[in-house]
Amino acid sequence: MVSSLNPKAIVIRSSKIVHKSLTPHPLARFVTEEAICLMFRIGFDDIYTVECWRYVVYVHAQGVSSFVSYADFPPTVGVQPPTRADFIKWRRRWRKQHNQAHRKQAPEWWEEYFISEFWQAPTESVLHSWGELVGTIKFAFSEDTLAEIFNFYGHTSLLKHLQG
């Protein structure tokens, strides 16, 4: 039944992201609670606070107390799109990964992040914006992963078109 596949209603909650630096990091615009939840495999309610410092992000959550690089966060829509400098920062960060096979690619959870954002997109135009964003950073994914992401994008787009 198609109606049972509707994404949940938008939930408005107070942000737990606090900017502690007077000089924001260029990648600070991509820090989101959704990304933190996927990064650490926790729920929104488990996050106590996220502090954005000059060079790192401090995440304090239930069972988590960790410093995270800004380059670990995927881009998002609704803010300035990623620039060439952002691409360089991401690639430099990925080269530091211990897994040889993934040194040229984004972390695996980025795929989950984009699929989740496709699913939560309230309108076709927002979904299209997410699709364009993934298209600009397709270098970050293997061919198989990119095919999976765009396959899900196509299914989600079709569902939203049928609903709208």
In which residue ranges do the predicted regions lie?
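N-terminal accessory interaction module
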Residues: 3-97
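N-terminal acidic leader/helix
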Residues: 103-121
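Repeat-associated, polar segments at repeat-unit boundaries in modular proteins
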Residues: 70-106, 141-164
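Short amphipathic alpha-helical segments that mediate assembly, nucleic-acid/protein binding
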Residues: 32, 111, 124-127, 146, ...
